[in-house]
Amino acid sequence: MNPLIQEITKKQLRDDIPDFRPGDNVRVHAKIVEGERERIQLFEGVVIKRHGVGISATYTVRKISNGVGVERTFPLHSPRVEKIEVTRHGQVRRAKLYYLRALRGKAARIREKRR
């Protein structure tokens, strides 16, 4: 990669990102702009995938809201994400947990990792 691009992206990388993997439960504090106001919206769910490296890395969080599955993809180094909290570490054997989309209720639970 071009050294100039590397220098610019290095300044934009965040260093306050916790270590989390697919299967972990996270609480994402996202900044939402509504007209003139800016507020923090919580999005809590299971990380079903992480993708990419560097400034373009993303992760997808899935939660069930009113019986409907909701997935939201966040850029890992986005300034719109105020903070990421890991609430629970899950033990899974896959990097992409797309199979959770077909599961409901107790079948969609993920075993907690023993640390």
Curated annotation (Swiss-Prot):
Pfam families assigned: Ribosomal_L19 (PF01245)
Native species of this protein? Lacticaseibacillus paracasei (strain ATCC 334 / BCRC 17002 / CCUG 31169 / CIP 107868 / KCTC 3260 / NRRL B-441)
One GO molecular function term?
Answer: structural constituent of ribosome
Name of the encoding gene = rplS
Against InterPro entries, the record matches this protein to:
Ribosomal_bL19 (IPR001857), Ribosomal_bL19_CS (IPR018257), Ribosomal_bL19_sf (IPR038657), Translation_prot_SH3-like_sf (IPR008991)
> What superkingdom heads the lineage?
Bacteria
Keywords from the UniProt entry? Ribonucleoprotein, Ribosomal protein
UniProt KW Ribonucleoprotein keyword = yes
Under the heading HAMAP family, the entry gives: Ribosomal_bL19
The name on file for this protein is: Large ribosomal subunit protein bL19
Family matches, as PANTHER family: LARGE RIBOSOMAL SUBUNIT PROTEIN BL19M (PTHR15680:SF9), RIBOSOMAL PROTEIN L19 (PTHR15680)
Functionally, this protein is described as follows:
This protein is located at the 30S-50S ribosomal subunit interface and may play a role in the structure and function of the aminoacyl-tRNA binding site.
Matching SUPFAM superfamilies, A to Z?
Answer: Translation proteins SH3-like domain
For this protein, the parts annotated as crossing the membrane are none
Could you give one GO CC term from the UniProt record?
cytosolic large ribosomal subunit
**What Gene3D superfamilies does this protein map onto?**
2.30.30.790
Q: Family membership, please give it.
A: Belongs to the bacterial ribosomal protein bL19 family.
Which PROSITE patterns does the entry mention? RIBOSOMAL_L19
Q: Which GO terms describe its biological process?
A: translation
